[in-house]
Amino acid sequence: MSKIVKILICFLVAVVIVIMAIFCYFFVGRAVIAEDITWGVDFSQMQTEVLGLNWKETYLAIINDLGVKNIKIHTQWDWIEGKKDDYYFNDIDWQIQQAKNKGVKIIYVVGIKSGRWPECHAPAWMTSLSDQQQKDKVLEYIKEVVLRYKDNGAIINWQVENEPLFKFGECPAWYYDDGEFLEKEVQLVKSLDSSRPIIISDSGEQSNWFEAAKIADVVGITMYREVWAHITDGWGFYIKSFLSPVTYWRKALLVKKFFGKDVMCIELQAEPWASRTFYDVPLAEQAKTMNPDIFRQNIEYAKKTGLDKFYFWGVEWWYWMKTTQNSPEIWNEAKKLFQQN
């Protein structure tokens, strides 16, 4: 056997060993299950209205009937500043006041990309501005929000943008190209309010979370188990995540070790992810990616990740199913969980 062949074999063996070690680290074993888990929900006024619901009724039901004590509020810039320099905060004021009245803790999402399609919610008037002018207006908007609410005790965290490092959604061309803008946003928030930890969210499945950890005080991640894999406009397929619960735990350990940051789940799938917007497909199609059994499975899966904070994505859909489809099963299942929390 020649020397070159021996070297090649040794190299291949080393590669296999490294691959096996990586696989074992991220997929083999069990996480230490947290003794005290916090459960919350993500809430979007826009989403409730898209579903044809009364958003105030829905919000109050979340607090008073479900008994939720932790809410992440998704706000849309185009709703707040539909007219340039004319801010409308009445609806957000109401949401935060209701939370404060009931001792509910709020995570406030601020920025241009704040969740729910089309992800970036830029006002129509912004399109006539240059890229730099658009960035300046985003910072002005953030400043208005933080100064308005920084003295409100209901808010426990600012989340700057929603998955800003994950290229998904309809956003201005500069949004993902300017690698420093997110840091400018975070620096601005910290300069206005240094008392609250800042969350930067990232894809739980398609990222190592390191870039978010460099900027954030707390890393927020997503956790989606049953989704539609969109290949083209006319073709795709349903897929179930192959990730082990311990994958999230081990990634969180790396973030803690190298960056000293905690990781929390700010989006735990609890609504359908269908081939089209879920309210445009039949209930039978919706049930392929979310139903009471999948909901319970996702809760048990989440517990096994070792994380101790989870916010459900889909509470508006639960209420829609309960009040318009006579299907309160997930709402009632969640209610039992929140009563224990």
Protein language model annotation of sequence segments:
Residues 22-69, 74:
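Boundary/entry segment of secreted carbohydrate-active catalytic domains
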Residues 156, 262-341:
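Substrate-binding cleft of secreted/luminal carbohydrate-active enzymes
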